[in-house]
Amino acid sequence: MALQIKSFFKELNKLQKLYGDPGLFPICGAGCTKNPRYFFLLMNPTARNVSAFSGWKGIRAPWLGTKNIWKLLFKLNLLSGKTYKKTQSLKPSQWDEDFSLKLYQELAKNKVYLTSLAKCTQKDARPLPNRVFKEYFKQTRNEIYKTKPKCVISFGNQVSSIFLGKNVKVSDYQSSSEKIIINNRAFQVFPTYYPVGQGLRNMKLAIKRIKSINL
């Protein structure tokens, strides 16, 4: 099974030139591309992702070279202890193409797909304006339709609000969800606390929320 939807690459490269750092590559979603159990939707990639640089020859996928997102997946039993420990022990410069590929192959096996609403890579973590996220709205909906996940987990107020087209407070969604229709097909969306970066303090709340979802 393919780990990425390569038909998206050309458009994402164009958008990177418009909205991302010109010296970096965009980061497309990756993982289980056919009926994943979880479709995790986060914000946007930064230069902390080691696969965003021109010298990288392997899969360009979310969160490579970072640590916190893998803790979330481990706590959700979506990542093995062995793989998790390696993500935490490696320095960014020690991540390589082989381990990164095996990591996403494991996620695919565990029915996980990771992506960002905006795929344009920035040099730092400064917030993107809503208008940039909205440029990726159509592409993200296509991403959901092509993968056909059992559920979409949208992380954070900003991502959830833009994606759902209304003001969202994730604290109001402890036991509820939203439904979206894409090409006459319904998908359940579960707004959830943002678990990394500025939202690291909310990781326990995000884990509790995701574990409460019955699929």
Where do the protein language model's features map onto the residues?
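A polyanion-binding, active-site-adjacent surface
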Residues: 2-151, 157-172, 186-200, 205-213
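Catalytic phosphate/metal-binding cores of nucleic-acid and nucleotide-processing enzymes, i.e., regions
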Residues: 175
